[in-house]
UniProtKB/Swiss-Prot annotation:
GO terms for cellular component: mitochondrial inner membrane; mitochondrion; respiratory chain complex III. The lineage of its organism: Eukaryota, Fungi, Dikarya, Ascomycota, Taphrinomycotina. Component of the ubiquinol-cytochrome c oxidoreductase, a multisubunit transmembrane complex that is part of the mitochondrial electron transport chain which drives oxidative phosphorylation. GO terms for biological process: mitochondrial electron transport, ubiquinol to cytochrome c. Residues 1-50 are mitochondrial matrix. It comes from Schizosaccharomyces pombe (strain 972 / ATCC 24843) (Fission yeast). This is Cytochrome b-c1 complex subunit 8. The gene is qcr8.
């Protein structure tokens, strides 16, 4: 099962598959001293973050507000039902 295939099916190892050499491929590179990977990062990132927060704020704030209201209501209701007055009302 393991190992390289033998006979007519073996083409060669990775990078040396036995095919014709590639021609006509031109690559360009830029010196690391000429690159500016962080150019404009702080200027554009803060504006982009502010824009995204403003556009997506309602999609997050409204469900969060509803969930917080339900949480507060449940907590208050639980405290009431575990008080003397609450237990007295439940028994009736």
């Amino acid at each position: 099962m393991g190992g390289a295939a033998g006979g007519k099916t073996y083409l060669g190892w990775w990078g040396h598959l036995g095919g014709p050499k590639q021609k006509g491929i031109i690559t360009y590179s830029l010196s690391p001293f000429q690159q500016r990977p962080m150019a404009g990062f702080f200027k554009t990132s803060t504006q982009n973050m502010f824009r995204r927060v403003m556009t997506e704020g309602l999609y997050v704030a409204i469900p969060f507000g509803i969930a917080y209201y339900i949480y507060c209501w449940g907590k208050e209701r639980n405290e009431f039902l575990n008080s003397k007055h609450g237990r007295h009302l439940v028994e009736e």
